């Protein structure tokens, strides 16, 4: 048997073995475990959400004398702030459901420290003088209002035994930004050294761990550089410390949600990302602390900080970044290596969404525009591939003539290319250009909150999730659920069919081995990409259809 044929068969067998092996031994077991964990998590979480809501309500009404709370109410948020310790530990995102089920509760971001999903933020003061009593975790603040809303800020006050007065004004906008202004009035006869601090503390929940294609965990902009540490990184290192630095923001990022501290820009801060195992629970904390500031007797000091706690909407982070000069705030969204392409791709999709009201249709429009921009390149590629095919007999003759002299062989072939004005890599250019576009669209679909639960038409209810149908139960007609590696839906099949048709219309590769391998690519991609976000498959299928139309035009007029 010809060695080339043997190599071809070996390559195909190896490729299919890798695909099926990966699906069966890695993806399938992990998906099964994940499905089991998520089933348990969802069923228990519904109970927890109700219990926690009742618990919060009971605290507010029945135990007001012990743990008083200020209710938070805006079009985007609901929850409360504990007056004891001035802790932001009860926050629900009203506009986002946990899943697509009809009775799904809204997403809860912050939860009190004594709950299973503890997650909270604090802003406060410390002093290096032990004789000075400052507000702490046991301090119960006095408030002039029971409700915090965008229209109605809340003013808090507390006076220590030396007559030093502490004032806090909290405002919230219509989205997810809290502004906390602390004022210290030193009515004593002694100097008062203070340091401003902020912290976000979270109990780690393993079920929330995601794959490694996006960042989740401690993050921030320190000295105008983005700092990202995964949960595992911090767990291994125990801490990451940044000495006195310019801290624009630090926080903890999830796939779609962000909690962050934005300190006053008038000072430098020391920042820390920490891990600790307390009472059997893994806890992660990000915090900042300012240098010592001394308040003279009879003087006062005001410090303004902000807390962002909500959804990572692109336009919202952009707005905050511009309005408050928060460097790299949009990088809380993990746009990846192709940021310079990914974000404009999102802007384009979001722009057309404003007109058509459907991100799936927006993907189709953006794909048409990309195709038009690349038409000239595709036309040149076609001509180059055609010339290469015409030169193949001469290339074969040169190979036979200089088979034992590799240097002369390459020299003669390059001379032939130059004489014929052929660029051997020109045929690959459209594919090379499309690679960053492909990954950019994938990133947009995978990490942006705007794509979460965004429907298309028919059975597609979430562009960021895989096609829920499969040919192996006739797209739901047969009453059984195939294993995960057989979840090959209608859109993956359409992608493979259109890819095959486009190959049939394109010039065949000059190298027969490469040509044979390419014939199997639609089948390989069918299995490989069936678990990808369906929005990506819609893009690829539509791109193939446009390529078929484009190829017909090129074939006809060339």
Swiss-Prot record:
Name the chain's protein.
Membrane protein insertase YidC
For this UniProt record, the keywords arranged alphabetically read as follows: Cell inner membrane, Cell membrane, Chaperone, Membrane, Protein transport, Transmembrane, Transmembrane helix, Transport
Major place of residence: membrane
Q: Which InterPro entries does the UniProt entry name for this protein?
A: Membr_insert_YidC, Membr_insert_YidC_N, YidC/ALB3/OXA1/COX18, YidC/Oxa/ALB_C, YidC_ALB_C, YidC_periplasmic_sf
Q: Does the keyword Transmembrane apply?
A: yes
Q: Give disulfide pairs as residue numbers.
A: none
Q: What does this protein do?
A: Required for the insertion and/or proper folding and/or complex formation of integral membrane proteins into the membrane. Involved in integration of membrane proteins that insert both dependently and independently of the Sec translocase complex, as well as at least some lipoproteins. Aids folding of multispanning membrane proteins.
Span-the-membrane segments of this chain are 5-25, 332-352, 355-375, 429-449, 474-494, 520-540
Q: Does the keyword Transmembrane apply?
A: yes
The record's family statement is: Belongs to the OXA1/ALB3/YidC family. Type 1 subfamily.
Q: How does it assemble?
A: Interacts with the Sec translocase complex via SecD. Specifically interacts with transmembrane segments of nascent integral membrane proteins during membrane integration.
Q: Name one GO molecular function term.
A: membrane insertase activity
- Pfam entry (one): 60KD_IMP
Membrane topology per the entry is:
Multi-pass membrane protein
Q: Where in the cell is it found?
A: Cell inner membrane
One Gene Ontology CC term in the entry:
plasma membrane
Q: Which one GO biological process term can you cite for this protein?
A: protein insertion into membrane
């Amino acid at each position: 048997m010809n060695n080339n044929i043997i190599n071809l068969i070996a390559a195909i067998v190896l490729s299919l073995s890798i695909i099926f092996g990966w699906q069966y031994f890695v993806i399938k077991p992990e998906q099964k475990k994940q499905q089991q964990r998520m089933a348990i998590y969802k069923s228990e979480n519904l109970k927890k959400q109700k219990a926690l809501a009742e618990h919060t309500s009971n605290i507010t009404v029945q135990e007001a004398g012990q743990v008083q709370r200020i209710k938070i109410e805006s079009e985007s948020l609901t929850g409360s702030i504990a007056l004891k310790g001035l802790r932001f530990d009860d926050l629900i995102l009203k506009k986002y459901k946990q899943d697509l089920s009809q009775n799904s509760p809204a997403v809860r971001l912050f939860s009190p420290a004594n709950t299973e999903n503890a997650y909270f933020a604090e802003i406060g003061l410390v002093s290096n003088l032990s004789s000075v009593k400052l507000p702490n975790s046991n301090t119960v603040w006095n408030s002039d209002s029971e409700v915090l809303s965008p229209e109605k800020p809340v003013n808090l006050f507390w006076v220590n035994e030396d007559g030093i007065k502490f004032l806090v004004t909290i405002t919230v906008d219509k989205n997810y930004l809290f502004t906390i202004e602390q004022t210290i009035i030193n009515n004593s006869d002694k100097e008062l050294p203070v340091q401003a601090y902020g912290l976000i503390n979270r109990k780690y929940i393993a079920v929330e761990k995601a794959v490694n294609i996006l960042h989740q965990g401690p993050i921030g902009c320190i000295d105008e550089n983005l700092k990202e540490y995964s949960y595992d990184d911090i767990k291994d290192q125990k801490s990451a410390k940044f000495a006195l630095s310019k801290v624009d923001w630090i926080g903890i990022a999830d796939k779609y949600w962000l909690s962050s501290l934005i300190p006053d820009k008038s000072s430098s801060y020391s920042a820390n990302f920490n891990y600790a195992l307390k009472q059997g629970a893994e806890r992660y904390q990000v915090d900042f602390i300012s240098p010592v500031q001394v308040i003279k007797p009879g003087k006062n000091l005001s410090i303004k900080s902000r807390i962002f706690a909500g959804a990572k909407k692109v336009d919202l982070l952009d707005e905050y970044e511009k309005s408050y000069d928060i460097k790299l705030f949009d990088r809380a969204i993990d746009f990846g290596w192709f940021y310079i392409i990914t974000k404009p791709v999102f802007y384009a999709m979001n722009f057309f969404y404003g007109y058509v009201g459907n991100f799936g249709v927006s993907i189709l429009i953006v794909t048409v525009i990309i195709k038009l921009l690349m038409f000239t390149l595709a036309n040149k590629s076609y001509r180059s591939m055609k010339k290469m095919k015409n030169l193949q007999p001469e290339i074969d003759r040169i190979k036979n003539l200089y088979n034992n002299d590799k240097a002369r062989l390459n020299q003669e072939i390059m001379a032939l290319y130059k004489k014929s004005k052929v660029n051997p890599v020109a045929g690959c250019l459209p594919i090379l250009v499309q690679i960053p576009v492909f990954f950019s669209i994938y990133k947009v679909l995978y990490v942006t909150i705007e794509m979460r639960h965004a429907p298309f038409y028919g059975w597609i209810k979430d562009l960021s999730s895989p096609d829920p149908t499969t040919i192996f139960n006739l797209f739901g007609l047969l009453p059984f659920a195939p294993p995960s590696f057989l979840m090959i839906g209608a859109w993956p099949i359409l992608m493979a069919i259109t890819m095959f048709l486009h190959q049939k219309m394109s010039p065949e590769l000059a190298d027969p081995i490469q040509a044979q391998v390419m014939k199997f690519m639609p089948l390989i991609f069918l299995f490989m990409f069936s678990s990808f976000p369906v929005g990506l498959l819609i893009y690829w299928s539509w791109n193939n259809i446009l390529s078929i139309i484009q190829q017909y035009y090129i074939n006809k007029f060339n």
